[in-house]
């Protein structure tokens, strides 16, 4: 007997087409079962089909979805989840045209977050991150990548990673941990970036032993770390058994996309300034292009990543929030879907695949997340919508009714979130 049977699903978005990364026409294809049903037993999906095919199945609990839509839990493959403080005091300065470097000199910018993160205890960081995870869950997200990077020293980076490990045990959302110690060059290492990167590399063996990070990331950009420094750093991390990511070409066409494809990174993220050559190399690789249009929007920039061109040329595109306190303070991945549709010229079908299938592959979870398939974890979302296009079309609000994580209800609209975490 099943534990739970969901019936009368108007559109069941299984996302279950070919295995592997979705490209070109596959990105524009959504497998949908009309009048669908899903069976769950011991936290695992055991039946996927039509309501007619589900007749005769017995379950302890039968849930009538009222003709509404059900999808897999969404996957957010790029966040800066664990941090101290906030930066709303900088908004007025930005609107006045105060340059970012001047804000930095006043102790703001990333330095403000670094200082607040250093001062916070691990438990304070955990409680704050729980608040944000609760919000992500309410937007339908069940798997999240979480980066460190607001320490720029060993003690605080460890604290962030340990906080992420604790959150993995205490919150329903599955977390994938990324070490981003190479987020910026600290003042004390100005002009000595290679020495700083070596210091970060020296932390990796113990990090691997304690299983505190699965990925290593670096910010490859003008004035931060060069392409050659980034490649050398990430290749050494790969030698130590880590998978790698790269913040690439966010501002300038520096060659980060090319580097990511060349070294076999799991993903290249941002890519606003990616060159034609970089896009071509990504299309011929298994590196996912994780686009972060919410960041471009919040920074009030004119030029967005060329998502339409990337998809047309065969790049596997994913979407993420880039949730962070400075350049994209939102947990709302549904808003990101809307921005991607409007500014990256992605279709609703492409947007859905970019927050499920391809986003799961961007964090090496393609075999466990992003699809509704027999044998997979029952990470499901019931939407207050009757078709998939409505979600990115009606922007700025959450359309989520109920979220199941491993077969258990983790969020229901109108009821208190699972935790009592406060910001």
From Swiss-Prot:
Which residues participate in Fe(3+) binding? 78, 80, 247, 322
What EC number(s) does this enzyme carry? Answer: 3.5.2.7
GO molecular function annotations of the record: imidazolonepropionase activity; iron ion binding; zinc ion binding
Residues binding 4-imidazolone-5-propanoate, per UniProt: 87, 150, 183, 250, 327
Q: Which domain of life is it from?
A: Bacteria
The answer to whether keyword Cell division applies is no
Which enzyme class? Answer: hydrolase
Give the co-factor note. Binds 1 zinc or iron ion per subunit.
Q: Which reaction does it catalyse?
A: 4-imidazolone-5-propanoate + H2O = N-formimidoyl-L-glutamate
Alphabetized UniProt keyword annotations: Cytoplasm, Histidine metabolism, Hydrolase, Iron, Metal-binding, Zinc
Q: Which NCBIfam families match?
A: hutI (TIGR01224)
Q: What is this protein called?
A: Imidazolonepropionase
Q: Species name for this entry? A: Bacillus anthracis
């Amino acid at each position: 007997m099943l534990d739970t049977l969901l019936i009368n699903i108007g559109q069941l978005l299984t996302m279950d087409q070919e295995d592997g990364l979705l490209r070109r026409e596959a990105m524009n294809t959504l497998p949908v079962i009309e009048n669908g049903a899903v069976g769950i037993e011991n936290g695992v999906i055991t039946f996927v089909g039509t309501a007619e095919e589900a007749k005769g199945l017995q379950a302890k609990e039968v849930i009538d979805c009222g003709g509404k839509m059900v999808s897999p839990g969404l996957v957010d493959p790029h966040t800066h989840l664990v941090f101290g403080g906030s930066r709303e005091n900088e908004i007025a300065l930005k609107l006045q045209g105060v340059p970012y470097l001047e804000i930095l000199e006043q102790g703001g910018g990333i330095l403000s977050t670094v200082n607040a993160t250093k001062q916070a205890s691990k438990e304070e960081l955990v409680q704050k991150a729980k608040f944000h995870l609760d919000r992500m869950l309410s937007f339908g997200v069940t798997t999240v990548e979480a980066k460190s990077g607001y320490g720029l020293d060993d003690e605080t980076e460890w604290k962030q990673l340990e906080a992420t490990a604790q959150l993995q045990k205490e919150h329903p959302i599955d977390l994938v941990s990324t070490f981003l110690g190479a987020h910026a060059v600290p003042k004390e290492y100005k002009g000595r970036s290679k020495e700083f990167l070596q210091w970060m590399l020296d932390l990796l063996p113990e990090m691997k032993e304690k299983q505190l990070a699965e990925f290593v990331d670096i910010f490859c950009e003008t004035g931060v770390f060069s392409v050659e420094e980034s490649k050398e750093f990430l290749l050494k991390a790969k030698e130590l058994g880590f998978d790698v990511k790269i913040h690439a070409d966010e501002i300038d066409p520096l060659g980060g996309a090319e580097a990511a494809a060349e070294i076999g990174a799991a993903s290249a993220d941002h890519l606003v300034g990616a060159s034609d050559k970089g896009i071509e190399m990504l299309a011929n690789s298994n590196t996912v292009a994780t686009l972060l249009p919410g960041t471009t929007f919040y920074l009030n920039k004119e030029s967005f990543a060329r998502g339409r061109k990337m998809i047309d040329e065969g790049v596997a595109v994913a979407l993420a929030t880039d949730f962070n306190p400075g350049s994209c303070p939102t947990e709302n991945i549904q808003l990101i879907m809307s921005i991607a549709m409007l500014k990256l010229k992605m279709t609703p079908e492409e947007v859905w695949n970019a927050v499920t299938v391809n986003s799961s592959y961007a964090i090496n979870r393609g075999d466990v997340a992003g699809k509704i398939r027999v044998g997979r974890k029952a990470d499901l979302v019931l939407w207050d919508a009757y078709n998939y296009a409505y979600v990115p079309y009606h922007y700025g609000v959450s359309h989520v009714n109920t979220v199941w994580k491993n077969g258990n209800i983790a969020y229901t609209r109108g009821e208190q979130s699972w935790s009592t975490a406060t910001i």
